[in-house]
Each structure stands twice: as C-alpha cells, then as structure tokens.
Amino acid sequence: MPSQDDVQNLPIDITFSRLGEWLVDRKRIPADWRKRVAVIRVKILKEFSSLPKEIDPFFQTLDPEVIGYLEVKKVYEILLKTTPESRNIFGRLSGASGVWEAIVRAFEKDHIYLGEAAQIIIQNVNYEIPYLKKQVQKVQQQMTELDRKEADIKRSVALSATKYEDACRELGLQGNNVRRELLETASSLPSTFSKILEVINSDSVTGAMEYYSAYVQDVHTEKDKPLRIVLQNLKYIRENPPSLSVFGDSEGLDADNIQSSENANGTDAAADSIDWDITVETPEIDWDVSMVEEVDSGNDLGSYEIVNASDIPENSPFKVEESQGLEVDVSEISWDVSVETPQVEEIGDSALLESNQTQLTDSTTQVLGSGGERSQLLETEYRNKILDDLYEVKAFLNQRLIELRNEDTLSLQHHVQAVSPMVLQQYSPETIEPMVVDISMAISLLTNKKSRDLIMILNSKRFLDRLVSELEEKKHREVKLRESLKDVGRRRMELQNSLSAIWPKQEAALSKTRELKELCETSLSSMFDGRPVNIRGEINTLLNAGVSA
C-alpha cells in the first residue's frame, strides 16, 4: 500500500481541452464563473478609459476587449509602484490603484481567474495560434514563390535583352532609333552587291563555270546535236553586270513616294502650260500598246513612257519574262500625228520645277545612293535565277568531290579521268575546294538574313513597319519585364510588412498561453497541498514548437 508521501508526490495530469470542466466538476470554481467574468469585464471597460496611460508604455499597448487576469494584475502592480501615496485614512488604496485592486480581488475570489485562463488556453491552442501559424506559413510560401518568380523574370530580362541585341547586331543596328538606323543601313547594299559581283567574276567561279560546261559538253552532249547551254544567268550577269544603285521607286521610303508624286504633279503642270495644238479623240484610236511605269530617265516624258521592245538585249535570259505582252510591230502602226514643239515662254516655272526635283533627288540618294537605274539585284526573280545557277554549280562540284575521294571507285575514276579531254583532267579535289568556297560565299551574300531584310526594306514599306514593330516589341518586352520586377519588389515589401504584423501576434499568443498554463499548474498545485499538476495535450507540442522556432 503506497504511503502518504508517495501519494503526495503523485502528479495530477489534466487534459487542457477539459480543464474548465475539470475545475467545475471538482468544485474548484463556481458553475456560474462565466457570468461573473462578464461582470468583471464590464467594469474593466468602464475603468480603462480613465486609466492614466502616460504613466507606463504598457498601458498604451493594451486592448480593453482582451484584458484578462494577467493584464489586470500587471496594471495594478504598475499603479502600486508609481502611486504609493494614494491611500486613504484607513490605509486602503484610493483612486485608480484602488479600483484596479478591486478588479484583481474580483478575479481571485473563488478562483474565477482559473476559469478564464482555461477558456483562453483552449481558444489559443485550438484556434488562435494555429490560424496565426498558417498565416505565417502562407506568407513565407508566397515570399518563396516570389523569389522564384523574380529569378525567372531576371533570366527573361537577360534573355530578352540578348535577343534584342542579337537582332540589332544581325542587322548592323545600335538599337537607339531602329527605323532611322534601318534606312541608313540600306546604304550598305551597294557594297554587298559589289562583293557579290566580285565573287561571281572571280577566277575560281570562272573556273567552276568552265569545268561544269566542259563536263556537260563531254558527258551529256550527244553527237550531231547542238551543245547544251548551261548557266545562262551567271554568264549574263558577268557580261551585263547590273547597276549597284538602289535608287528607284520604293515603298520603303517616303521620300521616294514624295518624289514620284512631285514628278507627276510637275509633269502635269508643264503639260498644262504648253499648247501642243493636238486634238486626240481616244475612242477613234486603238493603241494596242501596254503602258508600264518606269523611272524618269530625263527624256521629259514624265513617269510613264512607251517601252520599245528593241531596247531589251537579245541575249538576255530575262527577255521572255520581262517583255511578255510587248511584241508589237511598231512599223505597222500609223500614228498620223504630227508634233511640232512650239516656243515655250514660261521659262521660270520650268526652272523652278527642275530645282525642286533636284532637291528631292539629292535628299533621297543620301540613303539609297546615286544612279538613274535601280539595281536588278533588288528583284526577287532576278536573284532567284542567279541562285539557281549557283546552286547547280555547287551541287555539281560537291558531287565531283565525293566521286574523286571515294576509295571504292577511285580506280574507275582514274580510268575515266585518263580518257577525258585534257580540260577535265586538270581538276583535282584540291582545285575544286576553293571553287566550292567562293560559290558558297556568293550564295551566302545573296541569301543571308541581313541582305534579304535590307532588300525587303527598300521594296516594301509594310515590311519595314513590321520589322521595326518586331524589334520594338522585343525591346518593349524587356522594359515590361523590368517593370514587373518593380511590381515583385513592391509585393515583397507588402509580404514582409504582413509578416512583421503577424509574427508578434503569434509570439504574444504563445507567450500568454505559456504564462496561463504555468499559472493554472501553480494555483492548482497549491490547492492540492503541493502535489504536482501537469496540463497535458497538444498545448505542450504547440509551445515546444514555438520555443524551437
């Protein structure tokens, strides 16, 4: 049988969630303790307004709605220290100290404060502290996601900046004023065209053309049949090199459109000022001649003139496509019109017109270069025909390299080479390789993105607008991403402020719960003659987690 000392040392374990019921069941507090606590709170609210808050900073942090026994006791202790002389003739405290002493005594009567402490503990452990913990975790998770988002945005900013710089570098731009720089870069096209013609007229390309022609003549031409003509377009561009000027009608530059408009207006004005003394009735004459728009070549006919089919070279490979619909026998048409140039007296208007046209031409050629004829290399069909021949020669040379280096057919190739004409025997792999390099260079100059874009800029205003829009969109994306970085910074500041507001509340709830637990255990232990009292349950896990955190 356990002794009295053993019984005295046995602990009393109480589950925190049933602490209030346990106190009532064992008659430690009255059953109507809630009503009595409500009465005390009414008195606290009444007296709190008259509390001298300037005495201690603690008073300014109090919320009258949540003041409990611990806060009331601390207020009483502060007032007792600051106003020790506030006592009446009977030795009792008077004024604010006496009022708050009465409130403390009301809490301690019948141990009402234990019921309030049990209620606050259950409220904090089950609801308040878990809610605050979830809020803290939520804010911390949002900050983690924000850090990841910021890292992604920074990578995107760097990538966008790199893409914009690469796009500008590819076009030879600095990126300050894209539209103006694109138009200025168009001045590099004549030098590009010059390099293309230089490569096409080089010795290695000449040798490649001769090698291909001789090979076709030897291998693919039958006896008693005419020789097969190859590489007509390359031969034509070598014999008739196109103009290097990019001057001409272009949608890409407004100055050209203005010039065309001014030319047309000027021609009309000149025509109105001259009496040609010719009456033309359109319904009675069938001209049967197509009208094509050409650049004014200085013959005073304006922007439109009749194309003479005899002006096209006989050996041009482009004659068929460009002269369709113009096969007219001029000698069979009797115009029956006699034109006499009368004396023109309005010299002043003519001189003014020529001066205006000269100014427009000078301003346009600053970007496009001088020259009366627009380069044929600006035309897609013309370039495609040149490329067809270049690709044909390149494919032939690559195939010959494969055949000459194939060890399985090397003996056969030597035999074929021995019976071939002397002109074909001089070409070895070492001779063919430089030809392939130069042919590839010519193809690259014609097909690289910068050349194609600059040609399209001169040929189409819409393409220029689209290209400018694409470049500006890349730059705008970088700016937009940098703005989003600022938004991320502002959001982080908001989360930090929110965390700074929640964290003290959580710590205060944990601290108050710990104090109330110790208060209950100490008070109950004194009621049971010093037997140890332990409040068990989730409260300990929560408080220990708070300490470790």
From Swiss-Prot:
<dbReference type="Pfam" id="PF05600">
    <property type="entry name" value="CDK5RAP3"/>
</dbReference>
<dbReference type="GO" id="GO:0000079">
    <property type="term" value="P:regulation of cyclin-dependent protein serine/threonine kinase activity"/>
</dbReference>
<protein>
    <recommendedName>
        <fullName>CDK5RAP3 protein homolog</fullName>
    </recommendedName>
</protein>
<comment type="function">
    <text>Substrate adapter of E3 ligase complexes mediating ufmylation, the covalent attachment of the ubiquitin-like modifier UFM1 to substrate proteins, and which is involved in various processes, such as ribosome recycling and reticulophagy (also called ER-phagy).</text>
</comment>
<dbReference type="GO" id="GO:0140501">
    <property type="term" value="P:positive regulation of reticulophagy"/>
</dbReference>
<comment type="similarity">
    <text>Belongs to the CDK5RAP3 family.</text>
</comment>
<dbReference type="InterPro" id="IPR008491">
    <property type="entry name" value="CDK5RAP3"/>
</dbReference>
<dbReference type="GO" id="GO:0072344">
    <property type="term" value="P:rescue of stalled ribosome"/>
</dbReference>
<feature type="short sequence motif" description="Shuffled ATG8-binding motif 1">
    <location>
        <begin position="274"/>
        <end position="277"/>
    </location>
</feature>
<comment type="subunit">
    <text>Substrate adapter component of the UFM1 ribosome E3 ligase (UREL) complex. Interacts with ATG8 family proteins.</text>
</comment>
<keyword id="KW-0833">Ubl conjugation pathway</keyword>
<feature type="short sequence motif" description="Shuffled ATG8-binding motif 3">
    <location>
        <begin position="333"/>
        <end position="336"/>
    </location>
</feature>
<feature type="short sequence motif" description="Shuffled ATG8-binding motif 2">
    <location>
        <begin position="285"/>
        <end position="288"/>
    </location>
</feature>
